[in-house]
């Protein structure tokens, strides 16, 4: 059965399917939208008591529901200066060192940090010998992405690609999954060195958005696009620890890359398959400089 599921992913028109779902999710269909939201809540056992708007009728579109805000204070941010926090609600897929430009995906599978970053060689060099963490967001999860530490945006790259599912089954069977799928790479400058936040697209992910540029995808294309940003002055984009940096419309994956000597140890309980909650301790920092 697993082989059949994987084979179907290779055969399906994934981009066409994802864009169709995106149009449906953006539509405001009144009672039909509310019915779809109620079904989704029941199907995935979503705790709406955490949402700022707990009633399904409050959402005009499925996208509004899917990118719902949480109640203030429901995800308190760990403010300790030696702590990096979880950027999302989800589950840890993998984490560990970046060795010889290789990142571990699943048993028998690695992929290249250079490919992940859109073949930006200078960016890849900055993370050699550092660490990575991959976090999977299931459909039930809160889908806004937040900063694990304070950082100033220096670069963003859109990388075209496939739209395979990014669930654990696919990660075990599709080589180079996260470096094959469409993705948006944001590089931040922090007091601990560079931080890469890679927002990976997936089947039926209608769009990837950032707080500074809005919707990045769709539209899509076959060309890599890069934007550079000032890191000083009035136009610099600096986001605090715990501040929102982007969002997915339907579930996907975030891959984070950290510079060498940024992380001392991952926090207790942070390991593959561990559930993550945005704002909780994710890693202990080697550099004692303020990270918030």
UniProtKB/Swiss-Prot annotation:
Comment on bound cofactor: Binds 1 pyruvoyl group covalently per subunit.
Pathway where this protein functions: Phospholipid metabolism; phosphatidylethanolamine biosynthesis; phosphatidylethanolamine from CDP-diacylglycerol: step 2/2
Keywords: Cell membrane, Decarboxylase, Lipid biosynthesis, Lipid metabolism, Lyase, Membrane, Phospholipid biosynthesis, Phospholipid metabolism, Pyruvate, Zymogen
Keyword hit for Thylakoid: no
Catalyses which reaction(s): a 1,2-diacyl-sn-glycero-3-phospho-L-serine + H(+) = a 1,2-diacyl-sn-glycero-3-phosphoethanolamine + CO2
Residues recorded as bearing Pyruvic acid (Ser) in the entry: 252
An example Gene Ontology CC term for this record: plasma membrane
Function according to Swiss-Prot or TrEMBL: Catalyzes the formation of phosphatidylethanolamine (PtdEtn) from phosphatidylserine (PtdSer).
Protein name as it appears in the record: Phosphatidylserine decarboxylase proenzyme
Species of origin: Shewanella sp. (strain ANA-3)
Gene label: psd
